[in-house]
Amino acid sequence: MNSIRQIERLNEQELDKPFSSSWHQDYSDSAYIYIGNLDFDLNEDDILCVFSEFGEPVDINLVRDKETGKSKGFAFLKYEDQRSTVLAVDNMTNVKLLDRLVRVDHVASYKVPQKEKEPANLVPLGESGSSLSVSTINTSNLPDHDYKTIIQNEVEQTLSPKDEKDLLDPMRDYIHREKRRKLKHESSDRSDKSDSNRHSRHHRRHSRSRRHRDLDG
């Protein structure tokens, strides 16, 4: 119980902090998060139970295989308060759920491909009496590892096959950040190695110079 209260206090403090200079600010216009590497046995209710700790979910989309209906291991969830996405990303990334380390990240834009004129399904929220709008994503053309799709200003719209080709990759920004971080790290390593080599060459020149002076003397 004490640990739960401590988490709640930390979450409240985090929400009260200004994050204009934080990387989270880049996603201040989107209340959606991407949740990846989910166990295939988890369903919408399981995900809501875990992520409702950080705010009130108002939309969830657990992507399923079109033919089998089985989970493909990733989902998109929208919070009522955009600031809840910051808490979810900071607190749930690399947290183990059923022996899997889940990946959680912001989603910059999200288009929802639907079959033409197909109504959205509704998933009950249990005892709350309200419901979540769940859009059906057409996954027939997407491999399991391909995370194409996602929202654009929280709209549910019908997309033609041509439109689906223009879907944004929800992991694009995350991948770019990781690449920049890796390149920066490699650049730092090369710089340190270069400094070390220069120091070594200087030391060898200095040693040779001393030996020459000793011989001359």
Curated annotation (Swiss-Prot):
<dbReference type="GO" id="GO:0005634">
    <property type="term" value="C:nucleus"/>
</dbReference>
<dbReference type="GO" id="GO:0045292">
    <property type="term" value="P:mRNA cis splicing, via spliceosome"/>
</dbReference>
<keyword id="KW-0507">mRNA processing</keyword>
<feature type="domain" description="RRM">
    <location>
        <begin position="31"/>
        <end position="109"/>
    </location>
</feature>
<keyword id="KW-0539">Nucleus</keyword>
<dbReference type="InterPro" id="IPR035979">
    <property type="entry name" value="RBD_domain_sf"/>
</dbReference>
<dbReference type="InterPro" id="IPR045844">
    <property type="entry name" value="RRM_Ist3-like"/>
</dbReference>
<comment type="similarity">
    <text>Belongs to the IST3 family.</text>
</comment>
<dbReference type="InterPro" id="IPR012677">
    <property type="entry name" value="Nucleotide-bd_a/b_plait_sf"/>
</dbReference>
<comment type="subunit">
    <text>Belongs to the 40S cdc5-associated complex (or cwf complex), a spliceosome sub-complex reminiscent of a late-stage spliceosome composed of the U2, U5 and U6 snRNAs and at least brr2, cdc5, cwf2/prp3, cwf3/syf1, cwf4/syf3, cwf5/ecm2, spp42/cwf6, cwf7/spf27, cwf8, cwf9, cwf10, cwf11, cwf12, prp45/cwf13, cwf14, cwf15, cwf16, cwf17, cwf18, cwf19, cwf20, cwf21, cwf22, cwf23, cwf24, cwf25, cwf26, cyp7/cwf27, cwf28, cwf29/ist3, lea1, msl1, prp5/cwf1, prp10, prp12/sap130, prp17, prp22, sap61, sap62, sap114, sap145, slu7, smb1, smd1, smd3, smf1, smg1 and syf2.</text>
</comment>
<feature type="compositionally biased region" description="Basic and acidic residues">
    <location>
        <begin position="185"/>
        <end position="198"/>
    </location>
</feature>
<dbReference type="GO" id="GO:0005686">
    <property type="term" value="C:U2 snRNP"/>
</dbReference>
<feature type="compositionally biased region" description="Basic and acidic residues">
    <location>
        <begin position="161"/>
        <end position="176"/>
    </location>
</feature>
<feature type="region of interest" description="Disordered">
    <location>
        <begin position="119"/>
        <end position="138"/>
    </location>
</feature>
<keyword id="KW-0694">RNA-binding</keyword>
<keyword id="KW-0508">mRNA splicing</keyword>
<dbReference type="GO" id="GO:0003723">
    <property type="term" value="F:RNA binding"/>
</dbReference>
<dbReference type="InterPro" id="IPR000504">
    <property type="entry name" value="RRM_dom"/>
</dbReference>
<dbReference type="GO" id="GO:0071011">
    <property type="term" value="C:precatalytic spliceosome"/>
</dbReference>
<comment type="function">
    <text>Required for pre-mRNA splicing and spliceosome assembly.</text>
</comment>
<dbReference type="InterPro" id="IPR051847">
    <property type="entry name" value="RNA_proc/Spliceosome_comp"/>
</dbReference>
<feature type="compositionally biased region" description="Polar residues">
    <location>
        <begin position="128"/>
        <end position="138"/>
    </location>
</feature>
<keyword id="KW-0597">Phosphoprotein</keyword>
<protein>
    <recommendedName>
        <fullName>U2 snRNP component ist3</fullName>
    </recommendedName>
</protein>
<feature type="modified residue" description="Phosphoserine">
    <location>
        <position position="160"/>
    </location>
</feature>
<feature type="region of interest" description="Disordered">
    <location>
        <begin position="154"/>
        <end position="217"/>
    </location>
</feature>
<dbReference type="GO" id="GO:1903241">
    <property type="term" value="P:U2-type prespliceosome assembly"/>
</dbReference>
<dbReference type="GO" id="GO:0000398">
    <property type="term" value="P:mRNA splicing, via spliceosome"/>
</dbReference>
<dbReference type="Pfam" id="PF00076">
    <property type="entry name" value="RRM_1"/>
</dbReference>
<feature type="compositionally biased region" description="Basic residues">
    <location>
        <begin position="199"/>
        <end position="217"/>
    </location>
</feature>
<keyword id="KW-0747">Spliceosome</keyword>
